[in-house]
Regions:
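Phosphate-group recognition and catalysis centered on beta-loop-alpha active-site segments
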Residues: 1-213
Length: 213
């Protein structure tokens, strides 16, 4: 399917606010916080990017890393902590870690591009999307191909999803094959370049762009 066949892409967009606009100066150090997302929305962003992890007791939180250490005032692996324990941590020593559900309810007009970072997050994410009727507001993705396949299976074909790493490799190295191989994704989420075995490889090429369109 093409991207324009998904309701997710109906509002025109220029850019995503990555982790809630983490590089915008008022948000520095406050990535994936409600405050960061609110700043992005106030700037006019309709599309927001985030990541999700599951706590030990099955609460889905918007957080990039598997551990609290880098951006909060506490330490520990999220998958081994209860939500009560995680909720004591403050992003940049200031902000609460939001649940993904909090993002859906706090920003009802926003679209979310969500990366399921752990196996435990997949069913929780799909359940929340369905419970909130947010199928048109969310695009799901995961670097783990099994996680991505399970998301697609549980959410169905009407929910937009990103291409797998294998599909991206086909677009990059054998774009002619995309005419006969169904990548099952309307979205290619790629870096400009990627470092592989110490060598910087250009990912975004004219041939890839042409194949994607």
């Amino acid at each position: 399917m093409r991207a324009d066949e998904y309701a997710f892409f109906e509002p025109p967009f220029i850019a995503f606010a990555h982790r809630g606009g983490a590089m915008y100066s008022p948000n520095l150090g406050r990535e994936n916080s409600l405050q960061a997302f609110a700043e992005a929305v106030a700037l006019g962003y309709r599309y927001l990017e985030t990541d999700v992890h599951a706590t030990a007791d099955g609460v889905l939180i918007a957080f990039h890393d598997s551990k609290l250490d880098r951006v909060t005032d506490r330490r520990g692996a999220i998958a081994k902590l209860t939500y009560e324990e995680v909720s004591r941590a403050k992003i940049h020593g200031i902000d609460d870690i939001p649940r993904f559900e909090d993002l859906l309810t706090s920003f009802p007009d926003a679209r979310f591009n969500v990366d399921a970072k752990s196996a435990g997050s997949v069913d929780l994410l799909s359940d929340l999307i369905i419970a909130h009727g947010a199928q048109d507001r969310v695009c799901v993705n995961s670097f783990g191909i099994r996680r991505l396949h399970r998301l697609r299976k549980r959410l169905g074909s009407k929910v937009a999803s990103g291409a797998s790493g294998l599909a991206i490799a086909v677009y990059r190295f054998a774009p002619q094959l995309t005419k006969i191989i169904n990548t099952r994704a309307p979205v290619l989420q790629i870096p400009m370049e990627q470092k592989i075995l110490g060598v910087r490889l250009r990912v975004l090429t004219p041939a890839l762009v042409q194949a994607a369109h």
